[in-house]
Structure formats: C-alpha cells, structure tokens
Amino acid sequence: MDHLPIFCQLRDRDCLIVGGGDVAERKARLLLEAGARLTVNALTFIPQFTVWANEGMLTLVEGPFDETLLDSCWLAIAATDDDTVNQRVSEAAESRRIFCNVVDAPKAASFIMPSIIDRSPLMVAVSSGGTSPVLARLLREKLESLLPQHLGQVARYAGQLRARVKKQFATMGERRRFWEKFFVNDRLAQSLANADEKAVNATTEHLFSEPLDHRGEVVLVGAGPGDAGLLTLKGLQQIQQADIVVYDRLVSDDIMNLVRRDADRVFVGKRAGYHCVPQEEINQILLREAQKGKRVVRLKGGDPFIFGRGGEELETLCHAGIPFSVVPGITAASGCSAYSGIPLTHRDYAQSVRLVTGHLKTGGELDWENLAAEKQTLVFYMGLNQAATIQDKLIAFGMQADMPVALVENGTSVKQRVVHGVLTQLGELAQQVESPALIIVGRVVGLRDKLNWFSNH
C-alpha cells in the first residue's frame, strides 16, 4: 500500500491553495464543502474566486507565492501552471510538516486527492495512487451507479439511532443483525427519501420491536466455476456479511479474498474419491455454527444444486429447523464451455444438453442408450477417473467413434487448459488432464477452433 487513505476533519481549519485558475477552483470547491477556512494565493483569479470572496467564503491574497501563508495551515494545495512555483509550495509545506497536494505531480506531493463519491455522511474515495486518474474516475462512475442517492440520508438517520440500538441490544451480534435489517429495509429508505416522517417512525418502531432471530441461518452460495468476476452480486453480498464461511477446494483464492475479513473460514476440501472432511461432518458443522446464532455461508464451486450435494446439506438443516436460503451460481458446464468457445446448444448440432455425473454411488449405472443419442451435448462432471469407461460405454451403445470431445481443466481461470480430440481418444486424453476438469462430448466441440475467444486474450 503506497498511500494510507484517511478522511480529514478540516472544518474551521486554515488551508491554502496556491493558484487562481480552473484547477484551483475545483480544489477550492472541495475544501469549501469540507468547511475549511480557505486562503487562495495567486497572481490572478478567475471570476468565481471573486464571487466567493465577496460572499465571505474565502480570502484572496493577490501576488506571488508567499510561504508565510503556510504558517497557520493544516493543509495546502499547489495548483498553478508553473512547475517551479508548485515545487516551491511543496518544499515550503514539507519544511513545516504540512501535507501538500501538487496537482498532476504525485511524486512531488505528500498527499493525493482521490475521486470522491459523496453520500454524506457516507464517503467513498477511489485512488490509483496518482498513476491513472482516468481509471479512478471510471471506477468512481461505476460505484456512483451502485450507490443510491438517498444512502446518505439512511446513514445519517442511523447515526441518530446508535445510542438507542446500543441500549436495547446487549451484544455485538444482536446489534449487527439489527443494522443489517435496517440498511436493507427498502421501505425505510424510500420514506427517508420522501421526507415522510410518519412512515419513517412507523418503520423504525417495527424494526425495534421485531424479534431478532438467535438461531442463526445458513446461506448456500454458488461461487461459480473459478473466475471471481462470475460470482453473482448476491453471492458477493452474502460472503461479505458472513460470520463464518465453509468452503471447498473448487472455490478460487480470488473469491476467498472477497470474503469479509473478520469472518471465520473453515476449509472442507473435497474432490472425487477424497474428502478432507466427510459430508456428514460438513452437515454437522453447518448445523452447529447456525445453532450458535451465526450467519453461515456454505460456499461451493459452480452451482450448489448441480452435483454440489447442496440438497443433502439443506435436508439436515431443514430437519433441525434452521433457516436457510440459496444463492445460485454459474455452473461449471456453462462457464467452462463459454470460456472454451464451445456452445452447449446449436441449431445445427445439438437441440439438448445433458449434465451427467461421472462419479456414481456404488452400483449406480447411467442410461447409456439415451446418452449415446444424436443431436445433443453431454457434459460430464467428475468424470476424469471414469473417462475410459465413458468412452467404451458410449461407443458400445452406438455413438460414433469420431464424435468430438474436449476436456477443460481449471475452467474460466487464468490456468485454464483445453485438450480435445475424438471419442476414441477420451481415455488417453484424460491422462493429460488434472482435476478439476470437465468433459464435453458432442458435435458442438468442433466449433471451438472458430469460437475460442478466451485463450486469445
């Protein structure tokens, strides 16, 4: 971290801007909004500065830079079009241990100005450390679209309720649960935006009187196939609100880096034929932590209801009366095929797609006759160890030996690797691939050479 982000209290504190042009005006607006007692020193001033001075909002000092103006200052900004003057301002401020921003010269400055999203009292600052202001601006614009304009009113109202919340709810867990309900209450937010005091009071009293659930809850979240960008917004919200996250081997490090920092993490790594923690024990972990009143997120690769054993875990919770919900994820079949340039359906080649487990319960058997039918795509999950059997069975039940196949290893990640061939090579190809991997069988695989976009990036 090259810079420490801080928020300065400048109300009624002396600040200096050196410069009287458009850039200086933009900086002055920010300092005035923050309540600073502002002095502006320049040879000439654009008209806006004169307007502000006539309204008593700031003091103008016309003439060359006078470093004695820094003597009482808390903060300074050099915003002239003369690099020599800006350097003098920076050095004079440095000798007085005053933080100084030098416009367009981050290396000469002791602090930089971020892009700001103002939802006072909520403030969001975005900075690229001075290396790419345009990138910081683009990120700010994206965040602006995500944060409702009335969010500041909600935050300000929350501040008025803090003492009451502290008095009514004894533990930190209870207070956090109250605030989580408070901030996601759309009726309250709309009432505040409409200045409907009666509705605000009614909603507030309802929130305080509504009993907090001490049983805890479990949220089953699909993390997607690997690329953190494929995690859903709702999935992101859940992992950032969790008390504890129970996750498996298929959840990428990039996604785990998005988990709330003070949340507990329990690794229960699983892969075909090997369980770091047996499924029954995982079920009991979820149950035990929820019974402690915690918000538990069970984070699974792909989609939890597609070969993720999510249904089994929820049955345990249902039997115990533990509240639960499910956030779907992009399943591996969809993600891996898209990132490999293989459409799962196509008018000319496949009118249906089948998602098939290659890891069966003891004694299990697939409907090979229907799986070998034409005009469909097969996607085998956990099929590496059974690749030779899949090859032999499909051929035995009539699938053409030259049917295209692809194996996608570490799909959607920067480590993605795809090997492809024909059905008679499937068992051999599987020896070249490591888990996690997906097997795709069908004529659509032949489109990969034309549609493969990801490996070209």
UniProtKB/Swiss-Prot annotation:
Pathway: Cofactor biosynthesis; adenosylcobalamin biosynthesis; precorrin-2 from uroporphyrinogen III: step 1/1; Cofactor biosynthesis; adenosylcobalamin biosynthesis; sirohydrochlorin from precorrin-2: step 1/1; Porphyrin-containing compound metabolism; siroheme biosynthesis; precorrin-2 from uroporphyrinogen III: step 1/1; Porphyrin-containing compound metabolism; siroheme biosynthesis; siroheme from sirohydrochlorin: step 1/1
Residues the record lists as Phosphoserine modifications: 128
Region ranges (Precorrin-2 dehydrogenase /sirohydrochlorin ferrochelatase): 1-204
Pfam families associated with the record: CysG_dimeriser, NAD_binding_7, Sirohm_synth_M, TP_methylase
InterPro entries: 4pyrrol_Mease, 4pyrrol_Methylase_sf, 4pyrrole_Mease_sub1, 4pyrrole_Mease_sub2, CobA/CysG_C, NAD(P)-bd_dom_sf, Siro_Cobalamin_biosynth, Sirohaem_synt_dimer_dom_sf
Binding-site residues for NAD(+), renumbered to this chain: 22-23, 43-44
Keywords: Cobalamin biosynthesis, Lyase, Methyltransferase, Multifunctional enzyme, NAD, Oxidoreductase, Phosphoprotein, Porphyrin biosynthesis, S-adenosyl-L-methionine, Transferase
Region of interest: Uroporphyrinogen-III C-methyltransferase: 216-457
E.C. designation(s): 2.1.1.107, 1.3.1.76, 4.99.1.4
Active site: 248, 270
Example GO biological process: cobalamin biosynthetic process
Top-level taxon of the source organism: Bacteria
Catalytic reaction list: uroporphyrinogen III + 2 S-adenosyl-L-methionine = precorrin-2 + 2 S-adenosyl-L-homocysteine + H(+); precorrin-2 + NAD(+) = sirohydrochlorin + NADH + 2 H(+); siroheme + 2 H(+) = sirohydrochlorin + Fe(2+)
Residue sites binding S-adenosyl-L-methionine per the record: 225, 301-303, 306, 331-332, 382, 411
One GO MF term: NAD binding
Similarity annotation: In the N-terminal section; belongs to the precorrin-2 dehydrogenase / sirohydrochlorin ferrochelatase family. In the C-terminal section; belongs to the precorrin methyltransferase family.
Function: Then it catalyzes the NAD-dependent ring dehydrogenation of precorrin-2 to yield sirohydrochlorin. Finally, it catalyzes the ferrochelation of sirohydrochlorin to yield siroheme.
UniProt-recorded name of the protein: Siroheme synthase
